[in-house]
Swiss-Prot record:
Lineage: Eukaryota, Metazoa, Chordata, Craniata, Vertebrata
Protein task: May be involved in the regulation of spermatogenesis and sperm maturation.
One Gene Ontology cellular component: cytoplasm
PANTHER family: LEUCINE-RICH REPEAT-CONTAINING PROTEIN 18-LIKE, PTHR48051
Gene: Lrrc18
Induction field: Up-regulated during sexual maturation and dowm-regulated by experimental cryptorchidism and heat stress.
Compartment(s) of residence: Cytoplasm
Keyword entries, A-Z: Cytoplasm, Leucine-rich repeat, Repeat
Protein name as annotated: Leucine-rich repeat-containing protein 18
Main subcellular location of this protein, as a coarse class: cytoplasm
Tissue specificity as recorded in UniProt: Exclusively expressed in spermatocytes and roud spermatids within seminiferous tubules during spermatogenesis.
Domain of life: Eukaryota
Sequence ranges of the LRR repeats: 28-49, 51-72, 74-95, 97-118, 122-144, 145-167, 168-189
InterPro entries: Leu-rich_rpt, Leu-rich_rpt_typical-subtyp, LRR_dom_sf, LRR_domain-containing, LRR_R13L4/SHOC2-like
Amino acid sequence: MAKGGKGPKGKKITLNVAKNCIKITFDGRKRLDLSKMGITTFPKCILRLSDIDELDLSRNMIRKIPDSIAKFQNLRWLDLHSNYIDKLPESIGQMTSLLFLNVSNNRLTTNGLPVELNQLKNIRTVNLGLNHLDSVPTTLGALKELHEVGLHDNLLTTIPASIAKLPKLKKLNIKRNPFPNADESEMFVDSIKRLENLYLVEEKDMCSSCLQRCQQARDKLNKIKSMAPSAPRKALFSNLVSPNSTAKDAQEEWRLRSPSTF
């Protein structure tokens, strides 16, 4: 760390640079993609582009999100994953057009999540995974339009009943939390009969240790299969034609899906 306790100086984003990073999505949305650019401070110049529909600031080194982010009143999709953010501003509750919020892989604690999140009445996907949450924010129980919630890889010991009562919840990831009862997460998921508890990820998006564990599990499964009788069996997932075509496309669709597809 530099003298005086200051962190590394990140890349400076000018208005012209930001304008050149605007892309039009397949469904006609304006997306500002500033991911993986070494940004350490929220670039205030982008507030002049408040008509964008989607904002991607993921995989940078941003520590603080300013209250002024609420100027993005048309924003439907906000991706802040993989930064150093330890709290969200109260003003985020004013961004009532949000459908998708990803703040996974940051430094968020439960106290760093403002109660104003309960004002996001239209939001459908919230990813809070890979943070330091020791309890589930009660605000989530007020978000009746939620379809997908990520709470994996935190410090959770219990899940409130209000989550199970979310009427439109379809996907919930609560894996790798220190639940006192090892079966608690499975029991909770099973209690929501409508839940689709399936998560896909591409190899390029996994850390080396996770990838190694998955490969070991796959090798073990292949060994078991090779020892089993070779009688013809009906495929469990007939739509997964090949691992390098249909399945890969499905994985990419899940990872990059726009809120407009919900």
